Amino acid sequence: MGLLSKKASCNTHGQDSSYFWGWEEYEKNPYDEIKNPDGIIQMGLAENQLSFDLIESWLAKNPDAANFQREGQSIFRELALFQDYHGLPSFKNAMADFMSENRGNRVSFNPNKLVLTAGATPANETLMFCLADPGDAFLLPTPYYPGFDRDLKWRTGAEIVPIQCKSANGFRITKVALEEAYEQAQKLNLKVKGVLITNPSNPLGTTTTRTELNHLLDFISRKKIHLISDEIYSGTVFTNPGFISVMEVLKDRKLENTDVFDRVHIVYSLSKDLGLPGFRVGVIYSNDDFVVSAATKMSSFGLISSQTQYLLSALLSDKTFTKNYLEENQIRLKNRHKKLVSGLEAAGIECLKSNAGLFCWVDMRHLLKSNTFEAEIELWKKIVYEVKLNISPGSSCHCNEPGWFRVCFANLSEETLKVALDRLKRFVDGPSPTRRSQSEHQRLKNLRKMKVSNWVFRLSFHDREPEER
């Protein structure tokens, strides 16, 4: 260890949480309907597998894009050599158009202000490098995505100060909570450089309201700080209220040519809306030319392959496909969400009312032995090791109330979801009085048998004892 850098040998990587531990346990014993039916079911993975068939169908109908051809001629060599280092113009244009379409075409995006990154993770980290120095802080509303402890802090040296949101108002962001977080940062001698939100929220599965967005814009205006809006779930909104991008609020308030406009930055990717996390496609959109320039230089450390850009530029440019995909995907998400909520209700478990995302924020406070985070982790361990479901405890999301859990629903089949819900219901119900009675009766019966057998054995032993001597 002495030969390694402090960065490599430190334990500030943010992965020492129950969120990542649950993944490790799942990987040791993954559920498989045939090969391992008693394994752990993965419900801690926010992955959208519900509409993969739509993309596969498009690929089958568009062999040129899938096979890296143009008018039937291979362009593999062209794509394999150096292209525009920071993005194919065709892909940037297609991405900007898709982002606008995804927001109801109520706002438009300039492709020249897009910075391409290998996913949303480096997009968020790059913005931290651009906006904060080591020791500076960003305010994040709780609960928040557990990976931010790694993504925002580890390499950048930035700090996170939580904006404490409460279940009493559905974990909404309030003026008071914003001010309290800012004051807390000052008490810690941390310079606040901005606020980062996920809209729709991960892990809540709710869209940020116009009122909240106005509070945030007023707040960053007063404090002269930045706002990062991570909008990677914007296409997963499956019921009202609809998604409102912060860009739409800026436009409605006619703030386009103000300093506030330049301090608002968007993060987007295709990992959630299109279910393509393996393609590693992320975007930074900023109104600040200096941020765009700096982020573009930094993006050299995590580029998107030319092959990926070529394929996706063709897919995103097919407006018939994108329109159908977004509509059908939302229908499927709504149906799957309904199945999860119904199954949880059958087990006596409620969820925060949600309208977006690939997960539910599940209320298991009534199952805790005590109102403590220790009790929450104890319950979580039972669910992982006994029920064999990997879900994410609220404490890993920095929720300030024990007993909440994030449960994902779009990464598994309907049949596997049913198995998971059946397991959870059996766990919550516990042994029924009838089963307990039968079990106790069987235990006493076995005990009597054992006593009789022991008595017979002893009797037989004493009868034989003289002979054996």
From Swiss-Prot:
Q: Which domain of life is it from?
A: Eukaryota
Pathway this chain belongs to: Alkene biosynthesis; ethylene biosynthesis via S-adenosyl-L-methionine; ethylene from S-adenosyl-L-methionine: step 1/2
Required co-factors: pyridoxal 5'-phosphate
Instruction: Share what the entry says about its subunit structure, partners included.
Output: Homodimer and heterodimer. In vivo, the relevance of heterodimerization with other ACS enzymes is however unsure. Interacts with GRF3.
Induction per the UniProt record:
By indole-3-acetic acid (IAA) and cycloheximide (CHX).
Lineage of origin: Eukaryota, Viridiplantae, Streptophyta, Embryophyta, Tracheophyta
Q: Where, per the database record, does this protein carry N6-(pyridoxal phosphate)lysine?
A: 272
The record's catalysed reaction(s) read: S-adenosyl-L-methionine = 1-aminocyclopropane-1-carboxylate + S-methyl-5'-thioadenosine + H(+)
Cross-referenced InterPro entries: Aminotransferase_I/II_large, Ethylene_sulfur-biosynth, NHTrfase_class1_PyrdxlP-BS, PyrdxlP-dep_Trfase, PyrdxlP-dep_Trfase_major, PyrdxlP-dep_Trfase_small
List the PANTHER family: 1-AMINOCYCLOPROPANE-1-CARBOXYLATE SYNTHASE 8, BIFUNCTIONAL ASPARTATE AMINOTRANSFERASE AND GLUTAMATE/ASPARTATE-PREPHENATE AMINOTRANSFERASE-RELATED
Free-text description of this protein's post-translational modifications in UniProt: May be processed at its C-terminus.
Q: Which GO terms describe its molecular function?
A: 1-aminocyclopropane-1-carboxylate synthase activity; identical protein binding; pyridoxal phosphate binding
Q: What is this protein called?
A: 1-aminocyclopropane-1-carboxylate synthase 8
As recorded in UniProt, its EC number(s) are 4.4.1.14
Question: A Pfam family matched by this chain, by name?
Answer: Aminotran_1_2
Function field: 1-aminocyclopropane-1-carboxylate synthase (ACS) enzymes catalyze the conversion of S-adenosyl-L-methionine (SAM) into 1-aminocyclopropane-1-carboxylate (ACC), a direct precursor of ethylene.
Task: Return one Gene Ontology term, BP aspect.
Answer: fruit ripening
